[in-house]
């Protein structure tokens, strides 16, 4: 089975085509990448979105195809795409990983299911959907854009944009919703901008 290793990750596919002149890589057929936490270069960590749930577990990326550009340090996974770490799951039509900065983006029907803990330590399922997502681990910031919708045990919220600041070690520190914000809870509703 063809495979390549880079930056703490192992990627397998049915076929890899490497263009030496342009330094690009294409993976075809089912593509799977395994990122092992703690390995040199293994900077992406899905558990940061869910209070560190599954932090020591590998990140698995599954896609239909892969395009890599060595000079740009970028890998683009084409869909349908699925990423799993522990019980945390992220799906989208496309994933893009910047290997040098560890930044990550997803687009086209982004859906994430993350497990967090509230102030009393009670586990809570946090589901979010949007059209685009950007994650910057250096700044510990995440942004969901376009048709954002979140669902928890406490209710449903929709907005144009949702910005999150992550605590060091994982978990959300702050969420800021902007643009056509609507909050629905069992006992009341609210709207705002």
Language-model-derived ranges and their functions:
Residues 1-193:
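Mature-chain termini and adjacent capping regions
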């Amino acid at each position: 089975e063809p495979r390549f290793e880079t930056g703490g990750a192992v990627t397998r596919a049915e076929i890899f085509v490497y263009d030496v002149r342009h330094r690009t890589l294409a993976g075809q057929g089912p593509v799977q990448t395994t990122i092992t936490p703690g390995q040199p270069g293994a900077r992406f960590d899905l558990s940061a979105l869910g209070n560190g749930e599954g932090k020591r577990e590998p990140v698995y990326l599954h896609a239909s195809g892969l395009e890599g550009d060595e000079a740009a340090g970028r890998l683009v996974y084409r869909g349908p795409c699925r990423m799993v770490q522990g019980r945390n799951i992220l799906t989208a039509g496309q994933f893009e990983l910047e290997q040098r900065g560890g930044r990550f983006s997803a687009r086209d029907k982004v859906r994430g299911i993350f497990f967090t803990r509230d102030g009393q330590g009670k586990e809570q399922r946090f589901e979010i959907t949007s059209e685009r997502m950007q994650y910057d681990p250096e700044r510990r910031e995440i942004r969901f854009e376009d048709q954002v919708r979140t669902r928890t045990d406490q209710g449903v919220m929709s907005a144009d944009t949702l910005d999150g600041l992550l605590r060091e070690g994982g978990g959300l520190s702050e969420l800021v919703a902007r643009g056509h914000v609507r909050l629905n809870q069992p006992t009341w509703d609210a709207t705002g901008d």
